[in-house]
From Swiss-Prot:
One of its GO terms (biological process) is L-histidine biosynthetic process. GO terms for cellular component: cytoplasm. SUPFAM superfamilies: all-alpha NTP pyrophosphatases. This is Phosphoribosyl-ATP pyrophosphatase. PANTHER family: HISTIDINE BIOSYNTHESIS BIFUNCTIONAL PROTEIN, HISTIDINE BIOSYNTHESIS BIFUNCTIONAL PROTEIN HISIE. Pathway: Amino-acid biosynthesis; L-histidine biosynthesis; L-histidine from 5-phospho-alpha-D-ribose 1-diphosphate: step 2/9. Keywords: Amino-acid biosynthesis, ATP-binding, Cytoplasm, Histidine biosynthesis, Hydrolase, Nucleotide-binding. Gene3D superfamilies: MazG-like. It comes from Streptococcus gordonii (strain Challis / ATCC 35105 / BCRC 15272 / CH1 / DL1 / V288). One of its GO terms (molecular function) is phosphoribosyl-ATP diphosphatase activity.
Length: 104
């Protein structure tokens, strides 16, 4: 499904369609697209915090859509993202507690 979402975003970038929300985002540019990514990411956090599975699914879908648009707009392919994920798979993380911040 992510590939389909990405391909649809790519198609709309190459073939703008009047009245299309995706075309509108591309027309407004990267700042507008990134603003929407930020809004949707925040809504995912709120849905998770509220323990609302339905809202979590809906907001995650919105975030993935806007991320696909952002990837296309910045020229990053889904294959590039997948390559990064593949390279990270199986690597041991250096997880440790960070020191408490006591001065702001």
């Amino acid at each position: 499904m992510l590939e389909t979402l990405y391909q649809e975003a790519l198609k709309r970038k190459k073939e703008p369609k009047e009245g299309s929300y995706t075309s509108y985002l591309y027309d407004k540019g990267l700042d507008k697209i990134l603003k929407k990514v930020g809004e949707e990411a925040t809504e995912v956090v709120i849905a998770a915090k509220n323990d609302d599975k339905n809202e979590m699914a809906n907001e995650t879908a919105d975030l993935l859509y806007h991320m696909a648009v952002a990837l296309v707009e910045t020229g990053v392919s889904l294959e590039e993202v997948e390559a990064v994920l593949q390279a990270r798979q199986g690597k041991q993380s250096r997880i440790h507690d960070r020191p408490e911040i006591d001065q702001y």
